[in-house]
Amino acid sequence: MKTPPNQEKNNEKISLLFSSQRLTIDVHPSSVYHIVLSSNNADRHQVTLSFTARSRMMPLTRARPFGNHSSMFRMFLDAMVILAVASGVSLPPQLPGRRSHNASTPGAKKPGKDHGAMVSEFPANGVITPVYFPLRW
């Protein structure tokens, strides 16, 4: 996401390169965080996460299916966890669209079948609970 030149100096950008995958975290003056995870492979899978430091939700603003790129998915989850912890984000116990992923539950969907994204809630006891909700793109 491009910003006006006069705001560029106020932005902090962290870019990490893992093998052929790049993780970029932009911190904008408006306290909006953007995480971009992209691959240098021909597939060019890319996902962008955006949320405000004042918000308890982490809405996905743009995403493309991960396919079989499980390492990219793990990096994406790690980035969400790192940024959430650094920002002190605490997600509510129930999110819209939350669904069970227990195989014994009749009609339950398995993770990864509908491009569901996993975020984590950070209660006081430090236990991380997976929460699934559909991606929007």
Swiss-Prot record:
Subcellular location(s) of the protein: Membrane
Subcellular location, principal: membrane
Q: Where is this region: Disordered?
A: 93-116
UniProt keywords (A-Z) are: Membrane, Transmembrane, Transmembrane helix
Q: What is the name attached to this protein's record?
A: Uncharacterized protein YDR215C
Q: Taxonomically, what lineage is the organism? A: Eukaryota, Fungi, Dikarya, Ascomycota, Saccharomycotina
Q: Where are the transmembrane segments?
A: 75-91
Protein's membrane topology: Single-pass membrane protein
GO CC terms on record?
Answer: membrane
